[in-house]
Amino acid sequence: METQFRRGGLGCSPASIKRKKKREDSGDFGLQVSTMFSEDDFQSTERAPYGPQLQWSQDLPRVQVFREQANLEDRSPRRTQRITGGEQVLWGPITQIFPTVRPADLTRVIMPLEQRSQHCKPEEGLQAQEEDLGLVGAQALQAEEQEAAFFSSTLNVGTLEELPAAESPSPPQSPQEESFSPTAMDAIFGSLSDEGSGSQEKEGPSTSPDLIDPESFSQDILHDKIIDLVHLLLRKYRVKGLITKAEMLGSVIKNYEDYFPEIFREASVCMQLLFGIDVKEVDPTSHSYVLVTSLNLSYDGIQCNEQSMPKSGLLIIVLGVIFMEGNCIPEEVMWEVLSIMGVYAGREHFLFGEPKRLLTQNWVQEKYLVYRQVPGTDPACYEFLWGPRAHAETSKMKVLEYIANANGRDPTSYPSLYEDALREEGEGV
């Protein structure tokens, strides 16, 4: 499928990208990302051209995917003709398609537990985060707090019954625990809502008006349990060991056994969507689980000689973006999409290292990506495609199912992508 991209006479430098980037391919989906909006743009409820109403959060980009016709002979699409006759479109913030988690929560996941008691107080922690994040990251962190009530969370605790308030969050203690240290908190990976849909907890007697609201306290406890379980699962993945329900209950859940299903489910979702790790049951009798990379990928990006984090989650996102963009995406568009999640070319990320080197060198050497010059461009512009190893280990259908699952939808909700995936499977047979 030929890739179409409107450059609008601009160079290929990210600094020259227009506010709205369009890219269409013949009869398939195009992606429009609007990144710079004024505050007034988000004050009222907007209606998508062919979709439901959504209340847009302030200062967040939005994504509109629609059918358009493009000129196959060059990279300048013809005047678009939008299809309105029953064609379902994807209209929503890109952060609702791909997973996002707050830096403060990631710090809790990757920080050695034995250092937590020495960690700074909440007020000091926020100040330290802002210093580490820098101006851009601190602004994003502040925006995250404002957006928390709007976006559906990767760790959405949902509606719960009353939680026991006697126990405070107690992280698992292990003298042999492996540490995961971030290189820098200079990027923000989206937003995670601390708010569930509201628990119906009965408020007990209070001896002080300054005590924390029981409902918020219960939600915080549950949230802490989820994060601690993610930490435990990451350690088990690194040593390629099995984990049992009994171990999770004894190390993390403790007095909250009644809420194990919710905690385990949300921790598993976080592992899959953020780190690209699936938690699979191998023995229903003993409730034993194994942790494996998602989508049959044999790569996780963890180096034997360093305390790095799994990178297969980001790889799946990159493969998904390429697929959604018509199987080929200009480099500057890729970085614009990833920047929405706090991943910037040339800026060290506390989970993924230096992203540009990761995409243009490491994953090219691993044959997951093809990074090539766009023919006839001067100055040279580059684009990304799936590499042979990506085609061999996974498929468009599996990536589409991943995207649909992250968005809470069925793969058939994306007709053109679904047809493309089916066509690939048919050719494979």
Swiss-Prot record:
One of its GO terms (cellular component) is nucleoplasm. Keywords: Cytoplasm, Nucleus, Tumor antigen. Expressed in tumors of several types, such as melanoma, head and neck squamous cell carcinoma, lung carcinoma and breast carcinoma. Expressed in testis, ovary, prostate, cancerous prostate, breast and adrenal tissue. Residues 194-209 have a biased composition (Polar residues). One of its GO terms (biological process) is negative regulation of transcription by RNA polymerase II. Gene3D superfamilies: MAGE homology domain, winged helix WH1 motif, MAGE homology domain, winged helix WH2 motif. It is found in: Nucleus; Cytoplasm. InterPro entries: MAGE, MAGE_N, MAGE_WH1, MAGE_WH2, MHD_dom. Its main location: nucleus. Residues 222-421 form the MAGE domain. Pfam families: MAGE, MAGE_N. Residues 1-30, 188-215 are annotated as: Disordered. One of its GO terms (molecular function) is histone deacetylase binding. PANTHER family: MELANOMA-ASSOCIATED ANTIGEN 11, MELANOMA-ASSOCIATED ANTIGEN MAGE ANTIGEN. Acts as androgen receptor coregulator that increases androgen receptor activity by modulating the receptors interdomain interaction. May play a role in embryonal development and tumor transformation or aspects of tumor progression. This is Melanoma-associated antigen 11. It comes from Homo sapiens.
